[in-house]
Swiss-Prot record:
Residues 27-686 are extracellular. This is Protocadherin beta-14. It is found in: Cell membrane. Residues 35-133, 138-242, 247-347, 352-451, 456-561, 568-671 form the Cadherin domain. Disulfide bonds join 96-102. It holds the Pfam family Cadherin_C_2. GO terms for cellular component: plasma membrane. PANTHER family: CADHERIN-87A, PROTOCADHERIN BETA-14. It comes from Pan troglodytes (Chimpanzee). The chain crosses the membrane at residues 687-711. The lineage of its organism: Eukaryota, Metazoa, Chordata, Craniata, Vertebrata. GO terms for biological process: cell adhesion; homophilic cell adhesion via plasma membrane adhesion molecules; nervous system development. Keywords: Calcium, Cell adhesion, Cell membrane, Disulfide bond, Glycoprotein, Membrane, Repeat, Signal, Transmembrane, Transmembrane helix. It is a single-pass type I membrane protein.
Length: 798
């Protein structure tokens, strides 16, 4: 990890070096302009676009702006014309004081790509200040014994202008004793000296009043005056003297007010009043007089107002010692202000972008500069931001930095970054400044809507009301704003036969699904379709999910009786021999239910019977069987009503009516099996032989049964009355008799049997076997069969 970190650091250093190299080449171009102070706001300075070789459109598109070193807006760049204009009146004397030339430094910053141009604006001085004297009156005491040619220092005037507009000369009002001399000065300042041109006589003139005039070099020149009061004293031949001409002290800028700075002491060899010395500042500026004070008796210099290294680094104080005779001496006190780390770094934001798109990399977030008013290590700074942020600082030139995104961001992971720019100096103790920037990551449509489930299963009970809400689908989008607004729709079904548009609809805003019409389980048990979720981004993104609708069965179908038919025609009659044993299968009620599940579970029960207890119905399969042995006392004709009920809630039911005819000596006939399929006819010879043998035995058995029945009926016809059955007048309908012995119609042979009366013979007529069907037989055919039955058996069936 340490090696990797070192490599990353080395890469960053190389990148910063290349950026600084490019910027240093781009920043070597500079422009120089000048303007007179006090020029009106909005005055033209220069056409910056022309001087920099840039088009006006380029200035606007690249967001050109002017940034000064002290972060003050002295100039304004008109992006429409490219003109550089004054944004405020400039006072050269306030900006630069006595410094000449007075040059203000600016940077022209262009973006896309980032480029800097240096601009220097020289503020030219105008003669807007007159020379002024700090003292309205200058008192000079001169002994009458002073020799001709003696010089006397006087307070100089102050002129805030510089150059030719500054103080140039002094004149004295006409008199017979003095003239003004301007000596050469190492600091090139003009100091007036009063020179004695003619000896004074205390007795003749003890006091002189002269006017000292200071004249500058402006056009027209300006001047200032002060009164010079000269008092003639008696002879004093020794002037005060200082041990050294220059005193140097170092004072930290945080020295408390009233603190002692230094003590300056002079000696005078005279005695008495001429030896008494008083100390004063002379040629002292207003800053010196405000900052320091001197004890006129002891010569102690004390601090009067706070020191600030960042404003003034040193003070040169001229101190004059004057004795009682008017003689004086001078020395210089040099006070050097020591810097302490009392100024935290300053952060100035030139431009800032608080919202950046998430898919943009290396986007400029902020351009800022840092400044520390201290000096040395106290003024050296380190600029940094937090670790583990996808941003980095890129130094440009001097103390300018750019805050740039390191890579493309992901708003869904983090939508906001709080970046703290920390600037720390290297002083003791270290001071730091923090500047917080909140960067909002604007959304880009990079996430498709996602359904909460890949598939949905909805349940809908049939016979629903139209427009019924059957369920909902839901999708979420990790984006924000319009990019996260989801619209739902139905996708074309994969099955072209599915009329999806007439079955369901979806609310485009919330994903609610509605059934458009009532559904029938018996027609449609289930269907599936796809729904889509599309956001409103550009380009729009979408996803889909599968919806499966299961139609739940409702108990809306009553049982339907397949057999016996209940179509309003003449009912079928089942023949039961009186010799039948208990449990004899009379018939089987077959019913179906169009519903499903427990709604289609059918149960059977005997609802009504002509003779209760004679017959019973099996509840689960509908088989009607005899419950006991039949006797001669039992009626020959019986009517049974069987109730068929489903297991729904509430249950639905149907009834089947059966007619049963008790017959003496009747037994189940035997008929050959139906012809086999063509494929079975090709069985081997052994199978054929077995079938032929079985058919022969069956025929013999059938013949015996028929003979037995015929004999039996002939005997009874004379001894007993003819049995009656409630067969309606008209044709006697055919019926189906189950002879399989298993009670299952699907595995039985069924024969159409017709019974007729009116004949003197008691016999049955069997017709050909038929395939089960539930169509009503032809009435004419039934009538013919009934007539044949009557003729054959001689029965009178009513």
């Amino acid at each position: 990890m340490e090696i990797r970190g070192a490599l990353d650091l080395r890469k960053r250093q190389v990148l910063i070096f290349l950026v600084l190299l490019g910027l240093s080449r781009a920043g070597t171009e500079s422009a120089h302009y000048s303007v007179a102070e006090e020029t009106e706001i909005g005055s033209f300075v220069a056409n910056l676009a022309r001087d920099l070789g840039l088009g006006v459109e380029e200035l606007s598109s690249r967001e050109a702006r002017v940034v000064s070193d002290d972060n003050k807006k002295y100039l304004h760049l008109d992006l429409l014309t490219g003109n550089l204009l004054l944004n405020e009146k400039l006072d050269r004397d306030e900006l630069c004081g006595s410094t000449e030339p007075c040059v203000l430094h600016f940077q022209v910053v262009l973006e896309n790509p980032l480029q800097f141009f240096r601009v220097e604006l020289r503020v030219k001085d105008i003669n807007d200040h007159s020379p002024t004297f700090l003292d309205k009156e200058i008192l000079i005491k001169i002994s009458e014994g002073t020799t001709v040619g003696a010089t006397f220092l006087m307070e100089s005037a102050q002129d805030l202008d510089v150059g030719s507009n500054s103080l140039q000369n002094y004149t004295i009002s006409p008199n017979s004793h003095f003239y003004i001399k301007i000596p050469d000065s190492s600091d090139r300042k003009i100091y007036p000296e009063l020179v004695l041109d003619r000896a004074l006589d205390y007795e003749q003139e003890a006091e002189l009043r002269l006017t000292l005039t200071a004249v500058d070099g402006g056009s027209p020149p300006k001047s200032g005056t002060t009164l010079v009061l000269i008092k003639v004293l008696d002879i004093n031949d020794n002037a005060p003297e200082f041990p050294q001409s220059l005193y140097e002290v170092q004072v930290p800028e945080d020295r408390p007010l009233g603190s002692w700075i230094a003590t300056i002491s002079a000696k005078d060899l005279d005695a008495g009043n001429y030896g008494k010395i008083s100390y004063t500042f002379f040629h002292a500026s207003e800053d010196i007089r405000k900052t320091f004070e001197i004890n006129p008796i002891s010569g102690e210099v004390n601090l009067r107002s706070p020191l600030d290294f960042e404003v003034i680094q040193s003070y040169t104080i001229n101190i004059q010692a004057t004795d009682g005779g008017g003689l004086s001496g001078k020395c210089t006190l040099l006070v050097k202000v020591m810097d302490i780390n009392d100024n935290p770094p300053e952060v100035t934001i030139s431009s800032i972008t608080k919202r950046i798109p998430e898919n943009a990399s290396e986007t400029l977030v902020a351009l800022f500069s840092i400044l520390d008013q201290d000096s040395g290590d106290n003024g050296r700074m380190i600029c940094s931001i937090q670790d583990n942020l996808p941003f980095f600082l890129k130094p440009t030139f001097k103390n300018f930095f750019t805050l740039v995104s390191e890579k493309a961001l992901d708003r869904e992971s983090q939508a906001e970054y709080n970046i703290t720019i920390t600037v720390t100096d290297l002083g003791t103790p270290r001071l730091k400044t923090e500047y917080n920037i909140t960067v909002l990551v604007s959304d880009v449509n990079d996430n498709a809507p996602a359904f909460t489930q890949t598939s949905y299963t909805l349940f809908l009970r049939e016979n629903n009301s139209p427009a019924l809400h059957i369920g909902s689908v839901s999708a979420t989008d990790r984006d924000s704003g319009t990019n996260a607004q989801v619209t739902y729709s139905l996708l074309p079904p994969q099955d072209p036969q599915l009329p999806l548009a007439s079955l369901v609809s979806i609310n485009a805003d919330n994903g609610h699904l509605f059934a458009l019409r009532s559904l029938d389980y018996e027609a449609l048990q289930e269907f599936e379709f796809r729904v889509g979720a599309t956001d409103r981004g550009s380009p729009a993104l979408s996803s889909e999910a599968l919806v499966r609708v299961l139609v739940l069965d409702a108990n809306d179908n009553s049982p339907f009786v397949l057999y016996p038919l209940q179509n309003g025609s003449a009912p079928c009659t089942e023949l039961v021999p009186r010799a039948a044993e208990p449990g004899y299968l009379v018939t089987k009620v077959v019913a179906v239910d169009g519903d499903s599940g427990q709604n289609a579970w059918l149960s059977y029960q005997l609802l009504k019977a002509t003779e209760p207890g004679l017959f019973g119905v099996w509840a689960h399969n509908g088989e009607v069987r005899t419950a006991r042995l039949l006797s001669e006392r039992d009626a020959a004709k019986h009517r049974l009503v069987v109730l068929v009920k489903d297991n729904g809630e509430p249950p639905r039911s149907a009834t089947a009516t059966l007619h049963v005819l008790l017959v003496d000596g009747f037994s189940q006939p035997y008929l050959p099996l139906p012809e086999a399929a063509p494929a079975q006819a090709q069985a081997d010879s052994l199978t054929v032989y077995l079938v032929v043998a079985l058919a022969s035995v069956s025929s013999l058995f059938l013949f015996s049964v028929l003979l037995f029945v015929a004999v039996r009926l002939c005997r009874r016809s004379r001894a007993a009355s003819v049995g009656r059955c409630s067969v309606p007048e008209g044709p006697f309908p055919g019926h189906l008799v189950d002879v399989s012995g298993t009670g299952t119609l699907s595995q039985s042979y069924q024969y159409e049997v017709c019974l007729t009366g009116g004949s003197g013979t008691n016999e049955f007529k069997f017709l050909k076997p038929i395939i089960p069907n539930f169509q009503v037989h032809d009435t004419g055919k039934n009538m013919g069969e009934i007539e044949n039955f009557r003729n054959s058996f001689g029965l009178n069936i009513q």
